[in-house]
C-alpha cells in the first residue's frame, strides 16, 4: 500500500489538517525533477553547472533544494506547533488527574482507617434530618471546582456535584485514566505517522533526485520535540503505575490488559451472521402475517398497533445503517455521542439485538394475524410488549446489558427533559421520537383498547380520543423543554429559543390535526394546513442552515459549505430535495380529507417516509458535528473536572465516608472481576 493511503487510513480524522502533507511533498519533488533550476536562484549559472549537477552537489554538501527545504520547514513548524498544543493539553489533563488521584487516595486511606477503628458513623444518629440537611448545605459551600476547562459554548456542561460518593469517584477516576491513556496513544500515533512521513518523503527525494540526505535528515529533525517519544512514553508509564496501584493491587500486567484492551480490534462476523439468521427468519413471517389481514374492525386496530411496533424497530435498523455510513466515511460518531469507546457496543452488536426483537415481533404478529389461538388474538400485542420489556430490563440472563441500560437511562433523560443539562445524545434521541408520532399516538390507543377490553374500539381512535392527539404532540413538547433548558444554561436566545419556536409550530400542527379529526370542518382544516405548512418551511430551512449547515453566506452569496465529508456535491443536493418532499407530506391529509377521522393507513405511510427522512437527516446532522470537531481539531472526549470535587477540609472526607459506609475496602479488589463479568454481557 502506498504511504499516502497509509497515513490517510491511520491518521486521526479530526487532526487531518495538522498532519504532514505527504501528497504535496510528492508534487514538489516531481516539480523539482521536471524543472530542477526552479528555486535555485541562479546557482547553476554562477557555478557553471547544469541544474542536475547543482542538485547533486547540494546533496553532497547535505542541503535540500530550496523549494523542498522551504516545504519541510513549513510542515515541520506546523506539526511542531500542533504537537506542542497536544502536549500542553495532555499536561493539563495530567495535572487534573494527579489532583483527583490525591483526593481518591486520601479518601481511601481515611475510609480504611475509619472502618478499622469502627467509627463509621460520623454523623450522630441523634441529629435530626434538618441538621443533616444543614450539614450538607455547609459542606456544599466549602467545596470548589478543582479545575476549569471551557467547553463548547452551545453545549454547556453540568454544574459540578460536590457530594460524590467513594464508589462514584472511583468509577469516574478509572474512566478518566482509561480515556487519558487512549488520548496519549493518539498523540503517540500522531508523532509516529509524522516522523515516518518525513522519513518517507526524504527517501523519495533521494531516490528521485539521486542524492543521499538521510543522515542530514536525522540531524535536521532532531531539533523538533515531536520526534521525542519520551514525553508521551513517560506519561503512559505514569498512568500505568497509577492504574496498577489504585485498581489492580499493583498488578502491572493486569493493568496493562485493562489499559490496552480496545474494542475496535474485535471481529463482528458472528454478530452479522446471527442478525442475518434472525432477520431472514422473521421477514417471511411478517410478510405472511400481513397477507392474512382481513378488513374486520378488530383486525384494523390490531394492524395499527403492530404497525407502531414495526416503525420503532425500523427506526432502530435505520440508525444502525447510519452508524455503518459514519464508520465508512470515518465520522467519529462515538466521540460525538460521547460513548465510551471501550464499553459501547459496535453497531453490528446493536443490530443483532434489533434482529432478535424483530424476530419476536414477526412471530407474535404472525400468530396474531393467523389467529392460531382463537379468543387470545387480541392479547398478542400485550404479550409481545411484555416479552420485549422483560428482554429490555433483564440485567444478566440477556446479553448486552450495558446497551439496554443506556437505552433505559436515555429514555428517562428525555422524559425528564428540562431537569438536567441537555447533551447532544439527549436532543438527538428526542428528535428521533419526533419522527415517531404514529407510534407515540399508539400509546393512547393501546391502553384505551385494553382498558375497554376491546369493546367499542372506535371510541379509542383519533376521531374520538383527545389523549391520542396529546401523545402525538408529546415528542415536540419534550424538545421544547430541552430548548428552554439549553437557553437557561447558556442564556442565548439564538438558536435555542428560535429552535423552541420551531417545535411549537410542530405541536400546533399536530394539535389542529387532532382537533380536525375530532371536529371535522373547514375551520380546523384551514388551521392545520396553515400551521403544518409553516412548520414544514420553518423546519426545512432550519435543517439546511442550522442542523446540516449545508448553505453558508459568503461574500453576499449563498453557497455550499467548504468542508464536507463527501467530495461529490450531488448527494447533498439530493438530500435537500428529498428532505423538502417528505417535509411536505402533510399535504396528503388535505388531499384525502374523507379519511381524516381514522386515517391510520395515511398516518402509517407518512410516518414511514418521515423515519426514512430522519435516517438521512441523522447522517448529515452528525456530519456537521464531525466537521466542527475537525475544524477545532477535537479528537478526544473532554475531561469533565466539574464532575469531580476538591475538598476544602476534612469535612469533605467525613461526608463521603458517611454516604458510603456500607461500601467496604474489600470490594476494591472485586471491581476488576466485576468489570470482567460485565464485559461478558456488554
Curated annotation (Swiss-Prot):
Keyword Cytoplasm: no
Keywords, sorted A to Z: Cell membrane, Membrane, Transmembrane, Transmembrane helix
A GO MF label: phosphate transmembrane transporter activity
Residues exposed to the Cytoplasmic side: 1-274, 322-348, 399-406, 448-525, 593-682
A GO cellular component annotation in the UniProt record: plasma membrane
Gene Ontology biological-process annotations: cellular response to phosphate starvation; phosphate ion export across plasma membrane; phosphate ion transport
Superkingdom as given in the UniProt entry: Eukaryota
Domain EXS: 459-654
Places the protein is found: Cell membrane
Membrane topology according to the record: Multi-pass membrane protein
SPX domain span: 1-219
Major localization listed first in the record, in broad terms: membrane
Biased composition (Acidic residues): 665-682
Primary role: May function in G-protein coupled signal transduction.
Entry's family note: Belongs to the SYG1 (TC 2.A.94) family.
Protein name: Protein SYG1 homolog
Organism lineage: Eukaryota, Fungi, Dikarya, Ascomycota, Taphrinomycotina
Amino acid at each position: 500500500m502506498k504511504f499516502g493511503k497509509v497515513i490517510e487510513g491511520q491518521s486521526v480524522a479530526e487532526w487531518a489538517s495538522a498532519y504532514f502533507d505527504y501528497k504535496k511533498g510528492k508534487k514538489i519533488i516531481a516539480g523539482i525533477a521536471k524543472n530542477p533550476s526552479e528555486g535555485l536562484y541562479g546557482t547553476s549559472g554562477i557555478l557553471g553547472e547544469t541544474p542536475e549537477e547543482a542538485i547533486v552537489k547540494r546533496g553532497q554538501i547535505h542541503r535540500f533544494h530550496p523549494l523542498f527545504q522551504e516545504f519541510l520547514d513549513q510542515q515541520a513548524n506546523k506539526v511542531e506547533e500542533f504537537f506542542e498544543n497536544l502536549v500542553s493539553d495532555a499536561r493539563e489533563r495530567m495535572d487534573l488527574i494527579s489532583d483527583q488521584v490525591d483526593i481518591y487516595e486520601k479518601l481511601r486511606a481515611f475510609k480504611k482507617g475509619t472502618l478499622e477503628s469502627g467509627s463509621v458513623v460520623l454523623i450522630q444518629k441523634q441529629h435530626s434530618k434538618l441538621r443533616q440537611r444543614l450539614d450538607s448545605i455547609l459542606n456544599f459551600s466549602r467545596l470548589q471546582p478543582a479545575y476549569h476547562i471551557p467547553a463548547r459554548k452551545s453545549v454547556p456542561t453540568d454544574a459540578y456535584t460536590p457530594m460524590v460518593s467513594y464508589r462514584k469517584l472511583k468509577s469516574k477516576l478509572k474512566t478518566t485514566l482509561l480515556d487519558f491513556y487512549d488520548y496519549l496513544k493518539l498523540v503517540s500515533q500522531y508523532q509516529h505517522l509524522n516522523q515516518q512521513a518525513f522519513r518517507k518523503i526524504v527517501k523519495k527525494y533521494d531516490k528521485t533526485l539521486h542524492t543521499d540526505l538521510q543522515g542530514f535528515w536525522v540531524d535536521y529533525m532532531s531539533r523538533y520535540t515531536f520526534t521525542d517519544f519520551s514525553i508521551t512514553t513517560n506519561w503512559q508509564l505514569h498512568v500505568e503505575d497509577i492504574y496498577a496501584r489504585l485498581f489492580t493491587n499493583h498488578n502491572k500486567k493486569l493493568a496493562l490488559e485493562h489499559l490496552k484492551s480496545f474494542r475496535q480490534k474485535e471481529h463482528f462476523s458472528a454478530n452479522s451472521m446471527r442478525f442475518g439468521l434472525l432477520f431472514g427468519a422473521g421477514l417471511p413471517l411478517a410478510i405472511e402475517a400481513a397477507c392474512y389481514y382481513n378488513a374486520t374492525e378488530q383486525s384494523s386496530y390490531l394492524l395499527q398497533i403492530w404497525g407502531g411496533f414495526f416503525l420503532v424497530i425500523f427506526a432502530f435498523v435505520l440508525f444502525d445503517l447510519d452508524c455503518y455510513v459514519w464508520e465508512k466515511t470515518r465520522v467519529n460518531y462515538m466521540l460525538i455521542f460521547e460513548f465510551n469507546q471501550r464499553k459501547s457496543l459496535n453497531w453490528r452488536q446493536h443490530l443483532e439485538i434489533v434482529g432478535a426483537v424483530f424476530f419476536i415481533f414477526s412471530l407474535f404478529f404472525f400468530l396474531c394475524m393467523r389467529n392460531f389461538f382463537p379468543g387470545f388474538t387480541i392479547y398478542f400485542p400485550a404479550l409481545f410488549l411484555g416479552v420485549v420489556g422483560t428482554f429490555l430490563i433483564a440485567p444478566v440472563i440477556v446479553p448486552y446489558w450495558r446497551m439496554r441500560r443506556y437505552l433505559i437511562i436515555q429514555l428517562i433523560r428525555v422524559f425528564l427533559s428540562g431537569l438536567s443539562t441537555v447533551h447532544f445524545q439527549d436532543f438527538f434521541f428526542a428528535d428521533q421520537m419526533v419522527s415517531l408520532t404514529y407510534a407515540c399516538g399508539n400509546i393512547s390507543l393501546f391502553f384505551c383498547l385494553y382498558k375497554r377490553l376491546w369493546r367499542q374500539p372506535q371510541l379509542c381512535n383519533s376521531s374520538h380520543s383527545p389523549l391520542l392527539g396529546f401523545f402525538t404532540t408529546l415528542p415536540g413538547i419534550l424538545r421544547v423543554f430541552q430548548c428552554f433548558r439549553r437557553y437557561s444554561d447558556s442564556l442565548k436566545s439564538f438558536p435555542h429559543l428560535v429552535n423552541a419556536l420551531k417545535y411549537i409550530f410542530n405541536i400546533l400542527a399536530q394539535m389542529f390535526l387532532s382537533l380536525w379529526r375530532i371536529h371535522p370542518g373547514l375551520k380546523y382544516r384551514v388551521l392545520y394546513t396553515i400551521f403544518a405548512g409553516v412548520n414544514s418551511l420553518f423546519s426545512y430551512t432550519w435543517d439546511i442552515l442550522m442542523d446540516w449547515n449545508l448553505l453558508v453566506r459568503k461574500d453576499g452569496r449563498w453557497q455550499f459549505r467548504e468542508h464536507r465529508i463527501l467530495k461529490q456535491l450531488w448527494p447533498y443536493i439530493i438530500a435537500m430535495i428529498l428532505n423538502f418532499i417528505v417535509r411536505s407530506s402533510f399535504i396528503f391529509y388535505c388531499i384525502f380529507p374523507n379519511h381524516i377521522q381514522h386515517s391510520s393507513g395515511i398516518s402509517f405511510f407518512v410516518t414511514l417516509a418521515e423515519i426514512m427522512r430522519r435516517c438521512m437527516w441523522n447522517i448529515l446532522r452528525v456530519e456537521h458535528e464531525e466537521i466542527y470537531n475537525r475544524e477545532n481539531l477535537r479528537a478526544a472526549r473532554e475531561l469533565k473536572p466539574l464532575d469531580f470535587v476538591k475538598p476544602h477540609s476534612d469535612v469533605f472526607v467525613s461526608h463521603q465516608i458517611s454516604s458510603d459506609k456500607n461500601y467496604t475496602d474489600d470490594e476494591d479488589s472485586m471491581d476488576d472481576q466485576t468489570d470482567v463479568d460485565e464485559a461478558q454481557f456488554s
